[in-house]
């Protein structure tokens, strides 16, 4: 059948505006994070199942396992839209993926700006989280390990000072506290001992009963909030690099999905054009 003059041969039935490079690059991009999300969920669920029931209900707000599961599930759903949308060339799924990714990016950007502008309120929120974590220190093994790591990493003890540990029922200094750890602090507050082969987990025994000078000979007495703030100020470039590293994959995903959506729309227009002119004897 003769082709209408002026219609490019490249726009025949075999031509496609959809670039295989863009399509499969977006697919494998989402597949990678899809697998990562499933690993995150699996690790989070495993961590929850390994805990006792009472510990599992003790401190949901700061439980790292719960956080891992929630982030993993959200990432799974988001990357599912990206994977299937790119593979099936589904505009609805691709637009959903792009919109959700844009919202996540804007929320992260807003959180960073608000944290910088309202640094005092952010500091207060961090203090609240740390104090809540201190209260539930013995209730959650993951939380306990996280606090111990933070205190050793930043050479600190408690939120404001080492006496913050009195908020914990096991370390409380009240006379009616029957705990053997009464008026103590965790071993992670203790100053490191050179060439120590075995960790002395009782090194913080009775430290809250000592004054600042006496306690400073054995444990860290400064709180972790000030140490954390100082660390952030000293590593702004590093944190900026991490933020950029998180933002780049999101921006790439948004860009690729929008490019693919536009290509699919152009392909649909081409198919409609071919259908409308198929009955034309000069087509």
From Swiss-Prot:
Places the protein is found: Cell membrane; Cell junction, Adherens junction; Cytoplasm
Membrane topology summary: Multi-pass membrane protein
Transmembrane segments: 25-45, 65-85, 97-117, 236-256
Residue numbers on the Cytoplasmic membrane side: 1-24, 86-96, 257-283
Tissue specificity annotation: Predominantly expressed in erythroblasts.
One GO cellular component term: cell surface
Sugar-modified residues: 172
One Gene Ontology term from the biological process aspect of the record: protein maturation
Disulfide bonds: 156-224, 157-189, 173-183, 190-203
Keywords for the protein's UniProt record, in alphabetical order: Cell junction, Cell membrane, Cytoplasm, Disulfide bond, Glycoprotein, Membrane, Transmembrane, Transmembrane helix
Statement: the UniProt record of this protein carries the keyword Transmembrane: yes
Residues in the Extracellular compartment per record: 46-64, 118-235
GO molecular function, one term: enzyme binding
Family, similarity comment: Belongs to the tetraspanin (TM4SF) family.
Subunit and interaction comment: Homodimer; disulfide-linked. Interacts (via extracellular domain) with ADAM10 (via extracellular domain). Interacts (via cytoplasmic domain) with PLEKHA7 (via WW domains); the interaction is dependent on PDZD11 being bound to PLEKHA7 and facilitates the docking of ADAM10 to zonula adherens.
Summary of the function given for this chain in its UniProt record: Part of TspanC8 subgroup, composed of 6 members that interact with the transmembrane metalloprotease ADAM10. This interaction is required for ADAM10 exit from the endoplasmic reticulum and for enzymatic maturation and trafficking to the cell surface as well as substrate specificity. Different TspanC8/ADAM10 complexes have distinct substrates. Plays an important role in normal erythropoiesis. It has a role in the differentiation of erythroid progenitors. Negatively regulates ligand-induced Notch activity probably by regulating ADAM10 activity.
Record protein name field: Tetraspanin-33
Organism expressing this protein natively: Mus musculus (Mouse)
Protein's gene: Tspan33
């Amino acid at each position: 059948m003769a082709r209408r003059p002026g219609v490019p041969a490249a726009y025949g039935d075999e031509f496609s505006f959809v670039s295989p490079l863009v399509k499969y690059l977006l697919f494998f991009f989402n597949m990678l994070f899809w697998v990562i999300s499933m690993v995150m969920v699996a690790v989070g669920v495993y961590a929850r199942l390994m805990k006792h029931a009472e510990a599992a209900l003790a401190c949901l707000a700061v439980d790292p396992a719960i956080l891992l599961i929630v982030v993993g599930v959200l990432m799974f759903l988001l990357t599912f839209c990206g994977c299937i949308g790119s593979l099936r060339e589904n505009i609805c799924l691709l637009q959903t993926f792009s919109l959700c990714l844009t919202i996540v990016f804007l929320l992260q950007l807003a959180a960073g700006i608000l944290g910088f502008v309202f640094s005092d309120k952010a500091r207060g929120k961090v203090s609240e989280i740390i104090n809540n974590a201190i209260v539930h220190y013995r209730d959650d093994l993951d939380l306990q390990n996280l606090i111990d790591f933070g205190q050793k990493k930043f050479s600190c003890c408690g939120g404001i000072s080492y006496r913050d540990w009195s908020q914990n029922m096991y370390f409380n200094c009240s006379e009616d506290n029957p705990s053997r750890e009464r008026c103590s602090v965790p071993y992670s507050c203790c100053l490191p001992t050179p060439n120590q082969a075995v960790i002395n987990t009782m090194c913080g025994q009775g430290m809250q009963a000592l004054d600042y000078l006496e306690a400073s000979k054995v444990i860290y007495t400064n709180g972790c909030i000030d140490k954390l703030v100082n660390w952030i100020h000293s590593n702004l470039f590093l944190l900026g690099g991490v933020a950029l590293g998180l933002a780049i994959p999101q921006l790439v995903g948004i860009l690729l999905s929008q490019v693919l959506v536009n290509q699919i729309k152009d392909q649909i227009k081409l198919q409609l054009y071919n259908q409308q002119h198929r009955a034309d004897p000069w087509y």
